Amino acid sequence: MDGVLSQEEINALLNNNDAADSSDEILTESEKDAIGEIANISMGTAATTLFSLVNRRVEISTPVVSFSNWDKIVDEYEKPCVFIKIGYTQGLNGSNILVLKEKDVKIITDLMMGGDGTNINGEIGELHLSAISEAMNQMMGSSATSLSSMLNRTIDISPPIAEVVDLKNTLNEGEIDSFLSEEFVKISFHMEIGDLVDSEIMQLYPPAFVKEMCKGVSCLLYTSPSPRDYAAS
């Protein structure tokens, strides 16, 4: 043994290192911190908007940023659920998906219609999807305003599209959004609405879109207050 690696061994080492780098560099630690802060501020604004729609105290916790894929979502999340796609038309190029549990959508819809949040029998229909789309339009619209201030440019969204998803094991091509077929960024929040909702909501992002949002906001990491829960009442 002369201690000299063969070309095959060198190639194998390089390939292994490339694979590790690909996994590790989905987001850097600073990007994870930045998107967490962006989500924290944006969802705080959204909580205030939701309070005005349902007339109940709304609490949304500080976010937890992680990486996920379709198989993990299928295994971990309640079925069926509602996916709301939010696309950006100005200032950012991309989209994200907000995931809500079916029961939570029914409660929010009933409250928006002037009910007490208990009329949740039956399957989700067009009324529910229309109502939650409008709620998300207002919530994410207010979040876009906050994001505009952070990024110092105008951010606009397209009308959200809501769809019931049964979380099958197989993701059909073109279903919801193509980025779900690969590893994506998951941002989880705990949400409470009065004494009616005590649940988890998720935002799903393609990594490239997260990186775009994180540009120019690193200063927030040094000037923002400590993590906190947002409550609207």
Where are these regions (language model features)?
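N-terminal intrinsically disordered, low-complexity tails
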Residues: 5-22
